[in-house]
């Protein structure tokens, strides 16, 4: 029979409790207590092992547990422990030694800062010590071990429920993990698998994918459902173009391209070619083909040319324009003969007949230039035996301003001969240069001969002077490279 503790006595009920009280008073803090008690259970022996060598009359020990009387408050802790050991040796080993070890583990966890729940369980176990049996003690121990195993599993998954867990709990959980049953961990593993399956990565942008992301067909189809903003993959664009060509498009431009590329019936081709031939013959008789009426590259079939020519209103050239087609809106390498012919008509007075295209076009703008243009080409030969009054380039008595106005529309190196307005000379040659018009005075010597300057040759008549300098360079500074090339005819 165990006696109740005396009033005023301390709550240390066993040898382990008294030892814990002394250690708690000497150690600096809970951490040191936890470290000390971590190694303490390894050297701890059970009551039966301690009772074997000494027997009933053995040496009393410090860490013995009393079965009945509690120490008096007047004595020290060491003497009370000795008395408890003596009484334990006389009475034999107690029955609740394992219960005291469980209570010791609960006290260790309470000192290390465990949760309230563990402290509550430990306190309950301490209060119910006198009423528990051996079966109840073993059940409490296994329950506590399974709780430690659950804590270790949660820490392994990164979700620790006990933030202040010490090293003692981890060591005891690792030592008792072999005895744990896998049935207690099954529901938690199943929940973790279900949560992982629900966390599916959905990526909507191609360039935001991580390198290990796996895209499914459903995600790609979901991206294609959105509105088309003009940017798409090359494969998708090719598929869209193929679908438009197969079904047909409402776009008029696409329809026009399909009509141009598609085959036509033979009867329609013959009609179009006949219309094109009639139209082309009218164009040749009326006016030459323009730049926007005929494409630069010749077409292979007559259908495209006919479609272009059946729309004369789309041409950039107006129908009322009398200017030649070679004069504007055509490149230089195109219709080169027409351009050269038009230039020769304007400035050279070519004897070549106009082309077939220019026969039916009236050139009203050229009528004002024809009286002042020469009928000969470059390097016109001058007849020196013909009298001066019969030469076409002799204009008689005209002023300097009138001579310049007649040379204005002409090319460079155009010339005419007129009577000089100064009293020093009788005749003067008006010449057009790149800088403007110059007037060369023909000097007359005492023996009635003509020369341009003192170093030049002397001639008997003005036609001989013009004939000579139509093949030789003029002896004047600024005109060394020029000759009399283009005579300007006088007005009739």
UniProtKB/Swiss-Prot annotation:
Keywords assigned: Phosphoprotein, SH2 domain
Keyword Phosphoprotein: yes
Top-level taxon of origin: Eukaryota
Coiled coil: none
Gene3D superfamilies, per database record: SH2 domain (3.30.505.10)
InterPro entries: SH2 (IPR000980), SH2_dom_sf (IPR036860), SH2_domain_adapters (IPR051846), SHE_SH2 (IPR035042)
Protein's name according to its UniProt entry: SH2 domain-containing adapter protein E
Residue ranges of the region described as Disordered: 46-193, 214-236, 260-332, 347-384
């Amino acid at each position: 029979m165990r006696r109740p503790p005396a009033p005023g006595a301390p709550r240390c009920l066993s040898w382990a409790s008294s030892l814990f009280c002394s250690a708690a008073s000497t150690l600096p803090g809970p951490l040191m207590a936890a470290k000390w008690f971590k190694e303490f259970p390894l050297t701890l022996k059970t009551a039966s092992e301690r009772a074997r060598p000494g027997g009933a009359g053995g040496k009393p020990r410090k860490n013995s547990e009393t079965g009945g009387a509690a120490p008096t408050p007047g004595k020290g802790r060491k003497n009370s422990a000795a008395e408890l050991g003596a009484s334990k040796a006389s009475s034999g080993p107690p029955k609740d030694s394992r219960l005291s070890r469980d209570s010791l583990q609960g006290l260790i966890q309470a000192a290390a800062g465990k949760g309230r729940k563990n402290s509550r369980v430990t306190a309950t176990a301490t209060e119910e010590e006198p009423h528990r049996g051996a079966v109840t003690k073993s059940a409490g121990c296994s329950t506590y071990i399974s709780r430690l195993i659950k804590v270790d599993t949660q820490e392994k998954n990164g979700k620790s429920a006990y933030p202040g867990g010490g090293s003692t709990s981890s060591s005891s959980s690792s030592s008792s993990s072999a005895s744990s049953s896998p049935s207690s961990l099954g529901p938690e593993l199943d929940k973790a698998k279900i949560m992982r399956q629900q966390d599916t990565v959905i990526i909507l942008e191609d360039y935001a994918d991580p390198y290990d992301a796996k895209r499914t067909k459903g995600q790609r189809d979901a991206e294609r459902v959105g509105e088309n903003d003009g940017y798409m993959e090359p494969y998708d664009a090719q598929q869209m173009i193929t679908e438009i060509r197969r079904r047909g498009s409402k776009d008029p431009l696409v329809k026009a391209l399909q009509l141009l590329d598609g085959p036509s019936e033979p009867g329609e081709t013959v009609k179009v070619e006949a219309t094109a031939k009639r139209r082309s013959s009218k164009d040749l008789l009326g006016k030459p083909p323009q730049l926007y009426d005929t494409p630069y590259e010749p077409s292979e079939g007559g259908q495209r040319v006919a479609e272009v020519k059946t729309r004369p209103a789309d041409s950039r050239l107006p129908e009322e324009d009398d200017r030649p087609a070679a004069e504007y809106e055509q490149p230089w390498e195109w219709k080169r003969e027409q351009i050269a012919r038009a230039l020769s008509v304007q400035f050279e007075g070519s004897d070549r007949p106009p082309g077939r295209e220019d026969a039916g076009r009236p050139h009203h703008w050229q009528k004002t230039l024809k009286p002042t243009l020469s009928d000969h080409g470059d390097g016109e030969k001058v007849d020196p035996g013909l009298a001066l009054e019969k030469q076409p380039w002799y204009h008689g008595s005209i002023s300097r301003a009138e001579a310049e106005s007649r040379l204005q529309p002409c090319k460079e190196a155009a010339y005419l001969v007129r009577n000089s307005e100064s009293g020093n000379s009788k005749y003067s040659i008006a010449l057009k240069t790149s800088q403007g018009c110059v007037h060369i005075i023909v000097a007359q010597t005492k023996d009635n001969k003509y020369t341009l300057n003192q170093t030049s040759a002397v001639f008997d008549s003005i036609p001989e002077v013009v004939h000579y300098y139509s093949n030789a360079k003029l002896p004047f500074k600024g005109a060394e490279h020029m000759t009399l090339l283009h005579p300007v005819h006088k007005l009739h």
